[in-house]
């Protein structure tokens, strides 16, 4: 069974003088507890260009996104950092989209037909279902180049080893095996990079590399906090500020997984 969460658009906004402008604002509608919540994203760029961009996007067909359903709460997005990366990209591009939540423990036949390996995320682009977050985000960047989220090649791998070292530390049963130090080493390197080049990986503007790394840092924070009683040291102030900044972005808040789901999602690796 899949649950559909649909994005909507608002064609006009009121000006200070009480008139309406033609600026189209994209919004995502959620239903929680019988209430309808409308969330509006922030936008970047000059006002006329932004207005034209959003007007065009508002009339576009919503992208179809298959995502993991929550393990703990019905009709809620689940814990997949790769899916959140894709959703963050779509949000930052101000594109409308429909999410189809899939119970990965009981994969329906329709889902297995479009994703034979049974993996998420998978997005419908140009009438084709596309898998793998790397491929999906690159395809979205090419099809919708504005606003640009491209990360320069020389910066694209910044922070890329943090996730694997986090997993190594999380799974470790030996406090002296060096896995914690390996993670701290990667975080320290990233902190130094942000100090000299931040606040984001590509400087002043957020880019694809941030949208890939941030969901993984969120999982790191929740999972290590729960299973290891561990947190990023205060001495790594630039990393902590980076996480706080991105975690508070509208697009991140709208696509975030519940802490309970992150904890449940990592439990098999910890207990295995």
Swiss-Prot record:
Annotated positions binding glutathione: 68, 79, 107, 120, 133, 219, 266
Record text on subunit structure and interactions: Monomer.
Binding residue positions for L-ascorbate: 68, 79, 269
GO terms (BP aspect): acquisition of seed longevity; ascorbate glutathione cycle
Official protein name in the record: Probable glutathione S-transferase DHAR2, chloroplastic
Catalytic residues, chain numbering: 80 (nucleophile)
Source superkingdom: Eukaryota
Location of the GST C-terminal domain: 126-272
Transit peptide, residue positions per record: 1-57
Expression induction: Down-regulated during senescence.
Record function comment: Involved in ascorbate homeostasis. Maintains redox pools of ascorbate by recycling dihydroascorbate (DHA) to ascorbate. Involved in scavenging reactive oxygen species (ROS) under oxidative stresses.
Gene3D superfamilies hit by this protein: 1.20.1050.10, Glutaredoxin (3.40.30.10)
Catalysed reactions, as listed in the record: RX + glutathione = an S-substituted glutathione + a halide anion + H(+); L-dehydroascorbate + 2 glutathione = glutathione disulfide + L-ascorbate
Location(s), subcellular: Plastid, Chloroplast
Transmembrane segments: none
GO function term, MF aspect, one: glutathione dehydrogenase (ascorbate) activity
Family in the record: Belongs to the GST superfamily. DHAR family.
EC numbers: 2.5.1.18, 1.8.5.1
Organism: Oryza sativa subsp. japonica
Residues annotated as signal peptide: none
Keyword Oxidoreductase: yes
One annotated Gene Ontology cellular component of this protein: chloroplast
